[in-house]
Amino acid sequence: MVDIVTAANRWEFRERLDSMFEDRKRVFVDLLRWALPVTDGRFEIDQFDDANAVYLIISDSAGLHLGSMRLLRTDRSHILGDLFPYLCAHGAPTDTKIMEITRLCLCPRLPALDRRQIRNRLISGMVDYVLARDIKTLTGVVTARFLAQILKMGWRCEPLGLPRMVDGTTIGAFRIDIDEATPRLLQMTGIYEPVKFKEYLDCKV
């Protein structure tokens, strides 16, 4: 089950969001040592966690976070355009048909195989979600190691510029072109499976 959380239904998912923000702190602050704001000593929440953010969240039967990602509109404030435009050789792509993938977070307590399965379910849900909303392109900023994985997943993806060293970590920007062929391309590499979640198709963004 993948929950799609927006400003319209966020009140229903407060506990799941809190669990997600706690894991984001464990992963990005405690493990990766990113210099990010921490709220109440527990939650990694930044300026982009606003009313325009869309979250895809997978939880266990108790509502605890297993994996998540955040999607941001690029015609508004977003990470690539605001913080890392220099990673793009021709400027950060912005449009109402472009969304940015951010904060892909997998529960660090899960075994590696489980994390991979959760990641694939999140990617599948993301593809279904953006196709349903006629989003044509996804962008993002990731470490060079994860960028290499993204480029090999099978979809139409390319770097937006050369990776650069930032605060001791090599990072790069990418774009993914999304269309009706994307699910099939990802199925060929064992990543995509259709995700059935009733509420997301009815959810207003």
State where each predicted segment sits:
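Charge-rich, low-complexity intrinsically disordered segments
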Residues: 100-103, 169-205
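Short, solvent-exposed loop/turn elements at beta->coil junctions and helix N-caps
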Residues: 40-47, 161-164
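A short helix-loop-beta-strand connector motif used in the catalytic cores of GNAT acetyltransferases and
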Residues: 47-56, 76
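Short, charged, solvent-exposed linker or helix-capping segments at domain edges/interfaces
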Residues: 81-82, 112-113, 183-189
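Short amphipathic alpha-helix that is part of the acyltransferase structural core
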Residues: 1-44, 59-62
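Short, His- and charge-rich active-site/binding loops that engage polyanionic ligands
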Residues: 59-91
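Short hydrophobic/aromatic beta-strand element in the GNAT-like acyltransferase core
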Residues: 42, 53-57, 68
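Acyl-donor binding region in acyl/amide transferases
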Residues: 85-171, 175-176, 180
